[in-house]
């Protein structure tokens, strides 16, 4: 009966007995455990890429307001909001596969990791495992294979952060205390990065 199946299903969910997947030919819980590390590692890297790129671009766009640099960054952010991420990923994959020797279809180079210089994968976080093994080539290889997908995942977030940071900076740079700082003879860099940027980052950090 349906209600018995449903109760059995709920019991399995609670006890992490999620059955067997014929797609990957292993237990679902084991498949999730293996892939969760890869997903989390990629998500963290994408977050780092988005923040490290978008905040400086947003600040730079605000101090170059209505100039060609500002227009270029705003156009870049607009594309990030408008372009479907899956299409952008396919485009980059096609471009790098066709015009470079950058192999990005796997998490790592199997020849390096499994044949020429295998290391023990304990956590399935490849960056952490390569650091634990003290192997710089493995770390570089894992990072190289993650940069492109991390950039794709970060692009949409970058667009939002850039626009938010730019708007916050423009608001802050128009405040009275900024004009007072300028009247005291502080340089543009001091005004922007010491007085303006920290206050403009508060709403941005809240969003993150």
Regions from the PLM with identified roles:
Residues 11, 77-129, 152-158:
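Membrane-water interface segments at the C-terminal ends of transmembrane alpha-helices
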């Amino acid at each position: 009966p349906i209600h018995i199946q449903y109760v059995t299903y709920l019991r399995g969910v609670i006890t992490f007995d999620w059955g067997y997947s014929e797609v990957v030919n292993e237990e679902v819980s084991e498949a999730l455990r293996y892939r969760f590390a890869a997903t989390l590692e990629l998500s963290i890297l994408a977050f780092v890429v988005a923040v490290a790129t978008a905040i400086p671009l947003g600040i730079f766009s605000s101090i170059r307001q209505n100039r060609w640099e500002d227009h270029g960054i705003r156009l870049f952010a607009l594309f990030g909001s408008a372009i479907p991420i899956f299409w952008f990923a396919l485009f980059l994959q096609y471009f790098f596969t066709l015009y470079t020797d950058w192999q990005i279809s796997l998490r790592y180079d199997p020849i390096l990791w499994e044949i020429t210089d295998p290391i023990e994968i304990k956590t399935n976080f490849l960056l952490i495992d390569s650091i634990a093994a003290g192997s710089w080539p493995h770390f570089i290889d894992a990072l190289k294979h993650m940069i492109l997908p991390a950039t794709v995942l970060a692009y949409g977030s970058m667009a939002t952060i850039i626009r938010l940071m730019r708007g916050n900076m423009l608001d802050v740079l128009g405040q009275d205390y900024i004009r007072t700082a300028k009247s005291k003879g502080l340089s543009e860099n001091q005004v922007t990065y010491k007085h303006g940027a920290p206050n403009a980052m508060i709403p941005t950090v809240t969003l993150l």
